[in-house]
Amino acid sequence: EPNSMWS
């Protein structure tokens, strides 16, 4: 799955 840009 693609990585999320939330941290």
UniProtKB/Swiss-Prot annotation:
Q: Residue positions of the PTM 4-hydroxyproline?
A: P2
Under the GO molecular function aspect, what terms does this record hold? toxin activity
Asked whether the keyword Mitochondrion is assigned, the reply is no
Q: Which UniProt keywords apply?
A: D-amino acid, Hydroxylation, Neurotoxin, Secreted, Toxin
Is S-adenosyl-L-methionine one of the keywords UniProt gives this record? Answer: no
Can you say where in the cell this protein is located?
A: Secreted
Q: Which domain of life is it from?
A: Eukaryota
Q: In which tissues is it expressed?
A: Expressed by the venom duct.
Main localization is: secreted
Q: Which residues carry this modification: D-methionine?
A: M5
A GO cellular component term found in this entry reads:
extracellular region
According to its UniProt entry, the function of this protein is described as:
May act as a neurotoxin.
Q: Please share what else the UniProt entry notes about this protein.
A: The mature peptide does not contain cysteine residue.
- So what family is this one in? Belongs to the conophan family.
This chain belongs to the protein called Conophan vil-M
